[in-house]
Amino acid sequence: SLLEFGMMILEETGKLAVPFYSSYGCYCGWGGKGTPKDATDRCCFVHDCCYGNLPDCTPKPDRYKYKRVNGAIVCEQGTSCENRICECDKAAAICFTKNLNTYSKIYMLYPDFLCKGELKC
């Protein structure tokens, strides 16, 4: 769920999901269109695509369990949907960490109208 994803983001990056990732660029937050603004925004685009590959699941409200083993995120065994949602969230949290050096505050609270066009997953 968004709760676990938010905790993963905080643990990985040291940043709160809200406000740092909740409306960043064109893809972080609800919906998404246009070209990702930077590597962090691309993480969100890929995350959206990952969720899009789970048509039988409801990623935002579905809870799952994960733990950390030697600093690494490990998704715990759950239902098929829980496992796949956790893996999508884990990949995004790791992606955010890898791209912390290019995170730019100019893309926080980025206006949707500046995001034009459609990208295919």
From Swiss-Prot:
One of its GO terms (molecular function) is calcium-dependent phospholipase A2 activity. Its cofactor is Ca(2+). The keyword Transmembrane helix does not apply. It is found in: Secreted. Signal peptide: none annotated. Keywords: Calcium, Disulfide bond, Hydrolase, Lipid degradation, Lipid metabolism, Metal-binding, Secreted, Toxin. Disulfide bonds join 26-115, 28-44, 43-95, 49-121, 50-88, 57-81, 75-86. GO terms for cellular component: extracellular region. Gene3D superfamilies: Phospholipase A2 domain (1.20.90.10). Its EC number is 3.1.1.4. Ca(2+) binds at residues 27, 29, 31, 48. Monomer. Belongs to the phospholipase A2 family. Group II subfamily. D49 sub-subfamily. This is Basic phospholipase A2 VRV-PL-V. It comes from Daboia russelii (Russel's viper). The lineage of its organism: Eukaryota, Metazoa, Chordata, Craniata, Vertebrata.
